[in-house]
Amino acid sequence: MKFFWVSSLLGLLGLSTAIPLSTEADALLDRKTIYFGMKAYDDVNCKGSTSYTISFNKCQAYPNINSINALTDGAVCTVYVYSSNNCTGEPVFQTDSDGIECINVDAFETGSWKFKC
């Protein structure tokens, strides 16, 4: 009987420690959704061929991007567009996104962008 009580208690402790881990795993899955939900397009209406999949918090150069289709899944993320190829200097464009929307960045011929969440 004593063994059963101790093993049951350990089982409950294991369950209670697994819940925060599960929540953390869900947050990571949400980040993956955010990551794969960001696409850059040549068309200003976020239609046609996709130019890039956006990696957030990473500077990426582009030849010509007119718009971004952003799925941020509740998080507030900001698009920063730079006229330089390495995300230096002041952004020439920035806007926040907190849902599924087409963001017209009207980018220059060359430059770079960051998507920070």
Swiss-Prot record:
Glycosites: 86
Specify the domain of life of the species encoding this protein: Eukaryota
An annotated GO cellular component: cytosol
Which residues does UniProt assign to the signal peptide? Answer: 1-18
Keywords from the named record: Glycoprotein, Signal
Q: Does the keyword Glycoprotein apply?
A: yes
Q: What is this protein called?
A: Uncharacterized protein C922.04
Source organism per entry reads Schizosaccharomyces pombe (strain 972 / ATCC 24843) (Fission yeast)
